[in-house]
């Protein structure tokens, strides 16, 4: 499994061997949301970075999932339609949201690594 990268919006990304990138929300985001009850998955199409592509709803709130990089969504985790609780059970695994082909294959390296993301969470906790 490839090293995870993160966004400041608490999404994780994992580069796959086939050139695609898998996206989900971090355990921090999942815990902040509480029990996930619905996930609206994106359409299979191209999106610009920061475009809203998905929505996750919980018992506490609804939150947008934004496209982390320019690219084309090529697969969604349709299992989440019937079992959105997978996000609660395995946010970094079976609870993934979608896969996309990035316009720039190297852009993922410009996102936060684990250490930088941990510092972000710590800063948020102190704010």
From Swiss-Prot:
Keyword hit for Cell membrane:
no
Boundaries of every Lipoyl-binding domain copy: 20-101
Q: Which Pfam families match?
A: GCV_H (PF01597)
Q: How does it assemble?
A: The glycine cleavage system is composed of four proteins: P, T, L and H.
What does the entry give for GO biological process? glycine decarboxylation via glycine cleavage system
Q: Which PROSITE patterns match?
A: BIOTINYL_LIPOYL
Upper lineage is: Bacteria, Pseudomonadati, Pseudomonadota, Gammaproteobacteria, Pseudomonadales
Which source organism? Pseudomonas syringae pv. tomato (strain ATCC BAA-871 / DC3000)
Function statement = The glycine cleavage system catalyzes the degradation of glycine. The H protein shuttles the methylamine group of glycine from the P protein to the T protein.
Q: What is the name listed in the Swiss-Prot or TrEMBL entry for this protein?
A: Glycine cleavage system H protein 1
Q: How is the cofactor bound?
A: Binds 1 lipoyl cofactor covalently.
Q: Which domain of life is it from?
A: Bacteria
The PTM N6-lipoyllysine maps to: 60
Entry cofactors = (R)-lipoate
């Amino acid at each position: 499994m490839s090293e995870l990268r993160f966004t400041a919006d608490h999404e994780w990304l994992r580069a796959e061997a086939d050139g695609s990138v898998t996206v989900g929300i971090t355990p921090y985001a999942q815990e902040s949301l509480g029990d996930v009850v619905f996930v609206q998955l994106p359409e299979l199409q191209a999106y610009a970075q920061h475009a809203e592509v998905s929505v996750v709803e919980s018992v506490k709130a609804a939150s947008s999932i934004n496209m982390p990089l320019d690219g084309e969504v090529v697969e969604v985790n349709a299992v989440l339609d019937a079992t959105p609780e997978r996000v609660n059970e395995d946010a970094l695994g079976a609870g993934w949201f979608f896969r996309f082909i990035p316009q720039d294959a190297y852009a993922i390296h410009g996102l936060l690594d684990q250490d930088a993301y941990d510092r972000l969470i710590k800063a948020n906790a102190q704010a």
